[in-house]
Amino acid sequence: DGVAPEGYHAMSIYPEYFKIDGAWLLAEDSRMDCVPVCEDGRIFVREFRHIRAGDAIVCGRTESGEQGIYVHTTGFDPAPDGEGELADAGRHADNFAFRLGRSRETAFSREYDELYELLKHEREHGYVVWVMGPAFSFNGFSRTAFSKIIEAGYVDAVFAGNALATHDLEGSYFHTALGQDIETQENRPLGHYNHLDTINRVRLYGSIGRFIEEEQVSGGIMHALEKKGVPYVLAGSIRDDGPLPCVLGNAYDAQDAMRSHLRKATTVVCMATMLHTIATGNMTPSYRVLADGTVRQVYFYCVDI
C-alpha cells in the first residue's frame, strides 16, 4: 500500500484524458502530483497515501496522446482576437516573464472589477472557497468587511489556521488582537494574555460555536461563519498556541478536509497567507466537471502583498 509502480503517471493541474479500452476518459476530480487510478470505468485521482496494492494505476510519462495520455493545457486559453492572435497572457502562459503587457506595479483595479462580477455569478452558480491569513483578524475594518461578505452569501468555505480564528475571537471577546486594540493598534495592559485567555475559554466550552453562544460573542469572522453555517477548515501548525479545539493537528487530515471542499470549488480566493495558499494551490485543478458533464474553468486568485 502507498507505493506506485515504476513509471507511474503524475497528474498536473490541467484536464487529462486517458485511453482505456479504446475510450478516452477524463479525470473528473484531479489533483496535482497525485496518481490516476482506473476503477469501474472511471479515472480517480488519489494521493500516494491513499493508493492500495492492486490498484490499476496508469503508467506513462508522455502527455500528447501517444501513450494513451493527453494533457489538455490550452483548453481555457483566451479566444483569438480579430487578427487571430491570442491575448498576450495566453501566448506566454507557459513562460515566465516580468511583463505580460502590464508590470507588477500596475494597479489591479480591472482585476477587482472582474472579481466582483465573477463573485456575483458564483454566489448562485458556483462554490467559492476563501483561504485567509491572520492579518484579517488584526484590523477591525477588515474583520467587519469580510463578515459582510460572508453574510451576503459569497463564501461557501474558509480555510485558515489557528491564528486567524484565535485572534478574530480575541477581537470579539477583548477588542484586541495579540493584545493590541483592533482599531487604534494601541497596546492594552497585559494584552499579551488576551489570545491565550481566549483559547483557554474556547477549550473550556469545547467548540467555537458553543463559546460564541455561551459568551454571547457578536461580530467578527468566526461569528459570521457560525451564524451563516459556513464550513471552515482550521489546519494546525507546529507553532500554534493552544490550539483551539477544532484545529486539525494532523496535516494529512487537514489536507483531506480541505480537498473535500476543493472537489467542489469553482473559485478560490487566497489572501495574506503564503503557506495555506501554496497548500490550496497544490490541491486545486484548473477545471471542474459539473453534474451535467460540462467542464468549466476554476478561478484562482492570490493576494499576498
Describe the residue ranges of each PLM region:
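Metallocofactor- and cofactor-centric catalytic cores in central/energy metabolism, strongly enriched
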Residues: 1-177, 181-193, 200-215, 224-235, ...
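Aromatic-rich carbohydrate-recognition surfaces in CAZymes
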Residues: 219
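Positions that flank functional sites
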Residues: 240
